[in-house]
Amino acid sequence: MVPQTVNNARRLIMFGVAMGATAFAVGATADPPAADEQPPGTLQEITVTARKVEQRLQDVPISITALSGADLQAQGLSNAQDIVQSVPGITVSSAGPGQAKYEIRGLSSVGGESPTIGFYLDETPVTPPASATTGKSAIDPDLYDLARVEVLRGPQGTLYGAGSMGGTVKLVTNAPNTRAFAASTQSTASGTDGGGVNYAQKGMLNLPLIQDRLALRIVATYAHESGWIDRIVVPDFPLETNSGTTRGNVLGQAARIYSDVNDEDLSGARVSLLYKPTDNLTITPAVFYQHIYQGGMNTFDGDPGTLAHYQPFDVREPFTDRFTVYSLPITYEMDDLSLTSATAYWSRQSSQLEDGSEAVQDGLQLPAFDVSAGGVGPVQAFEFDDTHQFSQELRLASHGSPRVQWLIGGFYSDYYDQLYTGGGNIPGLLTAADGAFGTTNLFNVHEPLRVKEVAAFGNVTANVTDSLTVEAGLRYYSYHSDLSSTATGFAYGGDTPVIAAATASASGLNPMLNVSYHLNPDLMLYATAAKGFREGASNFPIPTTGSVGSVCLQNLQAIGRDSAPGQYDPDTVWSYEVGEKGRFLDRRVTFNSDVFYIHWSDVQQPVALACGLGFTANGSAANIHGAEAELEAEIITGLTFSQGVGYAHSAFAQSFAASGISAGQSLFDAPNWTINSSLSYARPVGDFTLVGLVRNSYASSSEDLSYQVNRLPGRDRLDLRAGVETKRWSAFLFVDNVMNRHNILENIDLLTFTGPSYNRVATDRPLTVGIDIGFTF
């Protein structure tokens, strides 16, 4: 019997082939306009820099989606996590603002400590190989006054290097304009079901200081989002039952209720200066700053499943994230060459406080929560991550020959991170268990990490004929990481520091080959093969002595080990893709589709031990096959329909018992289907334009891994937006999450011990209704 997923894949591939054949027939019979013309009424053309040079989106022979600044504004997309609503093949799991993890084509980042998706702010890579729980999380910048967002699907290891094995998300800001003054503001107010009032104020100012030579652009943002999850303190909190696998009833009379604790305040600014001392030289220094504060976590207790966290003590759980980027792009144009230098330094400080009271009581098998009854009292676990990275890229590109273009470059990065994590000071540890713990310190860890990487890359594009183009690229990379750790506390045998150090290093090559053929100016076929990789790293040592350590040792021995591995190696992917890109019916219809196959070797996987700790190891290989299709059509003047479909079937090739993985099991956080649909309308009426948008995004069910394998239901979200635009102002009414679905985004691990009975579940924002008013000057 053929599995249903295979049938689904075949149907989608056949759909893509049929649509492509239909498009080919239309394209072959129609007389298309010249390539550089854009007749009235045609769909918008977007220029992108996905391949480090400017190209029209439809001329880039890879699977890529781009959203222009106008698209972002028209669709009301305000932060990076929102882009998944309009892009097929990409999903996001998030425990809150600044904690998003992106997955493309099923390449999830459940294992390892670095992401599988590259994330760029202009020329600056902001996807470090971090060691913290939030290390795989991308920054969450506000999207106001962006030029565009580019989402590249498939490995981008040649031009973008480490971390881009699944694809790359690139945010491109608007450069200062040296010829015209400009300013804009946007004000938003809304209300969230089960929450409160949300509001935001954003503004942009562009000042041409010296015509054609010097300009300044300033963007500022402040936003407040109300919470919708409560924190409930329960007296006489029930103990876990059945050895910690079933939570006690927490729905009794509450002692105190804190409503909507996960409220968020975001403030940020972006300042950029464009200086052209000569016609050939452009210098664009910029500073981006953003600060996020959240009063509580975006998670509720999986058991009992209400939108609340129940706790035996009054323990706050605030989160902060501060991010600063200093960048200095310099471009010098010569007759046939372009020299680009991209220098950047960024820092990020994030902190999370978390209620560990329930986890510690259960993990240590204490008879009660209260100190008077033999417990340890309240526990506030913490994690603080202080990250810094310097990067330098230098590129030389040709643009003189119509037949051959080439690009060569070098890259260097120096990343330094300090992780501080612990269970806090717990006075009750001294009295619990008749003083057996002997300390008030459950655990306290300081973990510095330094990673240095160098790379050299090159790319050659040969236009063999007017229709046939062959492109080849190669990147050499080498990295070395040094990790040290100092651990104290009961979990590590007492207050005598346990000191450990480990190193990890690797080098290799990432090749790429692409062939494209234009059947006519509006229809292109392409095929590409590419390799990508993700860096390995060192593991934090697992204690094997003491009360907790002895249990960990038993857990390790049960999987055939006496200790955690000192490091895990890079994992790599080989991707093979065939696709088409076409514009038809006088360019009123755009249809792009592709099919792909990915082989993922040495997949980095988390290993969770029953003692509540864990490590990362290289597991079995995995295979992914799938297809994507994007359709955009102007049905009648002003009415545009967009449809994006992504299918990715993933499976582990072998079993990996240490992580509970069996052969044929789907990868974690990898839904088979992603579907994005929208219908937009714009009709001029005098000096006004009436606009409307209906958008639906869907991701099928998947599994994720915290302490155990969890089933994530499918996500289905409907948004509405309608309003009026003029040349100077706009006003929109919007309804987000119309059906008020509490879509589950992920299950999270705790900072202390973790286990199924106190699983925490992250959800997206409920039904939100509001108004959005903007002015331009």
Language model regions located:
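Outer membrane beta-barrel strand-and-loop segments of large Gram-negative receptors
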Residues: D31, F369-S398, A436-F437, F443, ...
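Membrane-embedded beta-barrel scaffold of Gram-negative outer-membrane proteins
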Residues: K202, P329-G356, H518, M524-Y526, ...
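Gram-negative outer-membrane beta-barrel transporters
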Residues: L407, N463-D466, V470, T590-W600, ...
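Short acidic/polar hinge/loop motifs at secondary-structure boundaries
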Residues: P125-R153, Q201-G203
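N-terminal Sec signal peptide and the immediately downstream disordered periplasmic leader
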Residues: M1-Q85, D279, I283, A633, ...
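C-terminal beta-signal and adjacent terminal beta-strands/loops
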Residues: S697-L705, V724-F777
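Transmembrane beta-barrel wall of Gram-negative outer-membrane proteins
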Residues: A182, G194-G295, R322-V325, T387-Q392, ...
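Extracytoplasmic beta-strand/coil segments of soluble accessory domains associated
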Residues: T49, Q81, Q85-T124, P128, ...
